[in-house]
């Protein structure tokens, strides 16, 4: 029995990733931690030299890494070869407090909507047997990953932002980014598997969708979670709790340690931004574009009069394909700003440019917009399903209105009741006719 192409693709992808660069979301989901530390992107350039020396600039904060060598004086530097520091910014960026309030409000909104939406989505798929098919199980896997991120990471990040400290210890410092990266990996790989599954469903017109979880879909989900966890391991290794001296007080900061012990982790830290952009952003968009193009060509190639009996079945598959495309589109829009800010930092930022301060302010604002947009992705998938899919919309209404019975069960119950009423009326009419016959005779 030949495995489906989607499983083969995921297995090949897992092998390449495990043997190659086992990297994961380094900065994207933990980025709310950057503004929590007092030295900000623009403000750090007007700090005193003693403060700069104590602050580990080459960290996982929202500072361009390229600015670290020029900004931090090295103790081992010879006196005869001084290194000129770039001119400081005239004024700091005044966005820190504003970001605190905005990020707290957005995080609370994501927390409430995400728990309600994702838990409702999981309950719908669990309670309704007719909803337990391959695509919906992949959607449930995606919702479970988002739910883990919402419950564990968002409250810790909000507290860290408001308290400007990390009181949770070194173990949680490694666990929180690990869960964050695994959650993003589950989202990316689930969207790739959904796109491949939709092409297979449309290409095999005669394959009737059944109720239940296909065996290969279950294997795909296990593979998705295993690969996501493997890719998150470097974050648990690289992150550490660092104590810095800032204005006479000691702050504990959870960050990717600037000095990694192994050569692989040094390479991991250096190539992180490009890896994040290519795998965690471009890959799902490229796979969706490729397989949806093939799916469109396949649909146009089929004759219009072919298999008329399957018209309703094909309409359902097209609706599911539209739903998956909507999920991928929402993912791309939510993560575009944050990835754009990372790439601009790598390509445009010059530490010796006298006009770099304006670019720093722009990148900082773009970072903050991207942080909040990326946070919305954890709660927006159930909303997108509600707006796009009629079946999910009816199930959401049924579940959120606290109706214990599922939508399909209620619909079948109403049909049974109407049939019973019709039979009862028909039986009464037959009795009436027989009684009339009796009386007339």
Curated annotation (Swiss-Prot):
Cellular-component GO terms for this entry: plasma membrane
Signal peptide: 1-26
Biased composition (Polar residues): 47-65
Sites of Phosphotyrosine modification: 438
Disulfides per UniProt: 173-254
Record-linked SUPFAM superfamilies: Family A G protein-coupled receptor-like
Membrane side Extracellular: residue ranges: 27-100, 163-174, 243-270, 350-361
Pfam families reported for this sequence: 7tm_1
Free-text function comment from the UniProt entry: Non-specific receptor for endothelin 1, 2, and 3. Mediates its action by association with G proteins that activate a phosphatidylinositol-calcium second messenger system.
Family, similarity comment: Belongs to the G-protein coupled receptor 1 family. Endothelin receptor subfamily. EDNRB sub-subfamily.
Name listed for the protein in its UniProt record: Endothelin receptor type B
Organism: Oryctolagus cuniculus
Lineage, uppermost ranks: Eukaryota, Metazoa, Chordata, Craniata, Vertebrata
